[in-house]
């Protein structure tokens, strides 16, 4: 029997997580363990908690919330504390409410859950559902169908990537999808804002906000294809070295020494 570990960054009560658990329980004869944050941890990136203790709080059969933990905490602790004899065959992070594309991947707690898994040597996928602000309720039907297909492929054929690589998967908002595209991550155009105010005691404070987020116009990027109605799959590697720039930096350093 296969073993699956699930986490997310929207918290243990999120709708995307509930839908995913229901589908996996119905479609796969697998031993499923869920460890999710006790509260929303969106944009927490790959942070882990080093300054205070963490504790599992059981909320169901093999279902735990991690008290004030991040997605990376959830995966790290689950692998070290809950799996004594055999590690999971797959880690799934999601389904996130909102896309994780372009450089957003570096901020994403959802993607960080998958990153932590592959750092520990476990195949992983990150799942995110794109939606429009006008949508009152998210439809996860397509996301669940595609996720089922991908997991079945992984179990039948093995994971398609090397160590320290994961699949970042995004699902379009449209009810009728055009298909699945393997693509690169796009490039964000960022316009951050910091809104200041003063509390009743006269102390200034700030709310961070990301306003008017947009992307560079690239035909085959994840965001462009997602907007056109395609589900996107982007292989992500944790090796951040810009190999093609190494000679340039050596030349630059040598020139500075002259």
Swiss-Prot record:
Gene encoding the protein: surE
Function: Nucleotidase that shows phosphatase activity on nucleoside 5'-monophosphates.
Gene Ontology cellular-component terms listed: cytoplasm
Protein name per Swiss-Prot or TrEMBL: 5'-nucleotidase SurE
Binding positions for a divalent metal cation per the UniProt entry: 9-10, 42, 96
Organism of origin: Campylobacter jejuni subsp. jejuni serotype O:6 (strain 81116 / NCTC 11828)
Protein family membership: Belongs to the SurE nucleotidase family.
Catalytic activity: a ribonucleoside 5'-phosphate + H2O = a ribonucleoside + phosphate
Enzyme superclass (EC): hydrolase
InterPro entries for the chain: SurE, SurE-like_Pase/nucleotidase, SurE-like_sf
EC number annotated for this UniProt entry: 3.1.3.5
Cellular localization per UniProt: Cytoplasm
GO MF, one example: nucleotide binding
């Amino acid at each position: 029997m296969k073993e699956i570990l699930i986490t997310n960054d929207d918290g243990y009560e999120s709708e995307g997580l509930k839908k995913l658990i229901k589908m996996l329980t119905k479609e796969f004869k697998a031993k499923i363990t869920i460890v999710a944050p006790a509260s929303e941890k969106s944009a927490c990136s790959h942070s882990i908690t080093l300054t205070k203790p963490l504790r599992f709080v059981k909320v169901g059969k093999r279902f735990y919330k991690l008290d004030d933990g991040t997605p990376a905490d959830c995966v790290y602790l689950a692998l070290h504390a809950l799996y004594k004899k055999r590690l999971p065959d797959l880690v799934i992070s999601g389904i996130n409410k909102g896309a994780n594309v372009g450089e957003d991947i570096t901020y994403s707690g959802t993607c960080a859950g998958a990153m932590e898994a592959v750092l520990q040597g476990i195949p992983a996928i990150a799942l995110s559902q794109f939606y429009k602000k006008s949508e009152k309720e998210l439809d996860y039907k397509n996301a669940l169908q595609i996720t089922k297909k991908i997991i079945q492929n992984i179990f039948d054929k093995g994971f398609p990537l090397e160590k320290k690589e994961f699949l970042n998967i995004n699902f379009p908002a449209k009810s009728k999808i055009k298909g699945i595209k393997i693509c690169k991550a796009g490039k964000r155009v960022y316009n951050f804002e910091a809104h200041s105010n003063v509390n009743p005691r006269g102390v200034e404070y700030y709310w961070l906000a990301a306003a008017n987020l947009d992307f560079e116009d690239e035909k085959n990027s994840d965001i462009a294809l997602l907007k056109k109605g395609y589900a996107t799959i982007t292989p992500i590697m944790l090796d951040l070295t810009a190999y093609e720039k190494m000679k340039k930096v050596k030349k630059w350093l040598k020139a500075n020494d002259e």
